[in-house]
Amino acid sequence: MFDFEQQLKILPDKPGVYLMKNSLGEVIYVGKAKILKNRVRQYFQKSKNHSEKVRTMVKHISEFEYIVTDSEMEALVLECNLIKKYRPRYNILLKDDKIYPLIKITLNEDFPRIICARNKIKDGAKYFGPYISTGAVYETMEVIKKIFPIRDCKLNIKKGNVKVRPCLNYHIGLCKAPCTGHISKEEYGKIISGVMDFLSGKNKDIIRKLKEDMDTLSENMEFEKAAELRDKIFALEKIIEKQKITTGGFEDEDFINIHSDEKDSCIQVFFSRTGKIIGREHFIIEDTQDLPKGEIVANFIKEFYGGTAYIAKTIYVPEIYDVQLLEDWLSIKKDSKVYIKIPQKGDKKAILNLVEKNARTTLQNFKLKFIQDKKMYETSLEELMEILNLDDIPHRIEAYDVSNIQGVDSVGTMVVFENGRPKHNDYRRFKINEVKGANDYESMKEILRRRFQNGMEEIKRIKERKLEFSAGKFSFFPDLILMDGGKIQVSAALEVLKEFNIDITVCGMVKDDKHRTRGLIYRNEEMPLNRNSNIIKLITRIQDEVHRFAVTYHRSLRSKRVLHSVLEDIPNVGVKRRKELLKRFLSVENIKKASMEELISTPSIDMRTAESIISYFRGYKS
């Protein structure tokens, strides 16, 4: 039994990180402290200043751990890493941990290329962005390639040493073919300078020059070429139009603001590059009632910039906690000075107000859709209760599926819907261990046995310790079980429930010959469902989700197995390097497509190893 009184007494008066755990040993909160003794003790002192969220969390704390650091900066870095590792339920977590793509010009090559990059590294290249999506990157790159005839091949072209046959791009005017010596390094460099001017926002001169060329072609009655230039100008202006809002500066800036209602918050980020707003992103953060705005913004910055590939030079916010600490942390990550500013008036304040207005609108729309969806889900669940003759609405529904190819890499999955909505934190994946070959019936029984055996054991441990109930991985049992399949799958589930003496309604989800959800199998009879009903929409969504989750897990296992076996054959790639490649690129296809720069930027991969990998895949037949 954890002795709170004793552990609170011996807390050190040093900086560090603390981890709060529930009765099942799961980390439910990670925080940092300038003085551990003071910060951790605050949670266990009765105070009206505690938010509802903190009071709820404290009820579920069964023990805590702490890690002492040499400085508050070290504590901040460790806190960010541990939050990413454990994803604790009471920390502010962004719905997606995306890395925003960049446009990279490989100035470290004699004849540079323009490519999409995920990480910014010190390799002599020039980076622009970040962009809001890879779609925005490729759209911009396509326009650039139409206007500026630069190469997009992966040939290692050195000045004067490569003579090959030019590719199709040369013949259709999209490349000057430096691979054949048709253009000098100096002339090619002028084209690249134009690309960098465009990406830096110096667009007026480029458009003016294109229009002059178009007029000249028209005067010379070369109307076809003039029309081509007209289309290029239109495409260029279309890209520029998307960056119409200006910020009055020429540096890279991010504008962050927040709007909160009585329960939730929306944080909006505007990305400004060289004085133009190039994109925006929003994040809905739930259960922020009673939390100060400055604390929410500080926590958001830690998570958002902890994962992004690019940090702007200046970040504007309405208010914030730990501003100096966060500035220092961001500056270390960027390797140059980063400023966090709170504008009081002027253009920056006006833009920040615009960001807040957008956050307010986004939150209102989110809530409106939530209410509309809630009504639809309630209707669906009520209909489901009626047709199955249940005593109550099935608030928690669990669905199961099995996936394999000829019995190889057999996996099972469980998805959870609460009140009609997916509860992703409760999704579970199972490797089939005991069943050999393609046997869906026995595989399904293995999955369900493990699920309910784990649930019974968790509940027993909680009761034995006489602790307040805390949801573990399997502690909550469903009101309804849906099997992706027919009578065989339903029979497997009922047999396992009988073993555990558990009474839960089980249905099978069946599809028609067009692979659309058709109806439910219940008590050995098929119940057809109206294609326009709310209930079929819910069942279809659940069936599609459990199937997607199963297939995705199966593919990931298969990909890892194939990747592992392939990498074993590559010279200079040992166990450590295989792990790093797998961690970075995830699939064999991504490894095969990786550029020299991307491979070298992977931990433990040097130039010799990268060349070995590229050489191997040139001769590899998948």
Curated annotation (Swiss-Prot):
Domain UVR: 204-239
GO cellular component, one term: excinuclease repair complex
GO MF entries: DNA binding; excinuclease ABC activity
Domain GIY-YIG: 13-92
CDD domains to which the protein is assigned, alphabetical: GIY-YIG_UvrC_Cho (cd10434)
Residues passing through the membrane, by range: none
A matching Pfam family: HHH_2
Single GO biological process annotation from the record: nucleotide-excision repair
Signal sequence extent: none
SMART domains, alphabetized: GIYc
Keyword DNA repair among record annotations: yes
Keywords, comma-separated and alphabetical: Cytoplasm, DNA damage, DNA excision, DNA repair, Excision nuclease, SOS response
Primary localisation category: cytoplasm
Keyword Cell membrane tagged: no
Function: The UvrABC repair system catalyzes the recognition and processing of DNA lesions. UvrC both incises the 5' and 3' sides of the lesion. The N-terminal half is responsible for the 3' incision and the C-terminal half is responsible for the 5' incision.
PANTHER family (UniProt xref): UVRABC SYSTEM PROTEIN C, UVRC/OXIDOREDUCTASE
UniProt similarity note: Belongs to the UvrC family.
Protein name per Swiss-Prot or TrEMBL: UvrABC system protein C
Species in which this protein is naturally found: Clostridium kluyveri (strain ATCC 8527 / DSM 555 / NBRC 12016 / NCIMB 10680 / K1)
Phylogenetic classification of the source organism: Bacteria, Bacillati, Bacillota, Clostridia, Eubacteriales
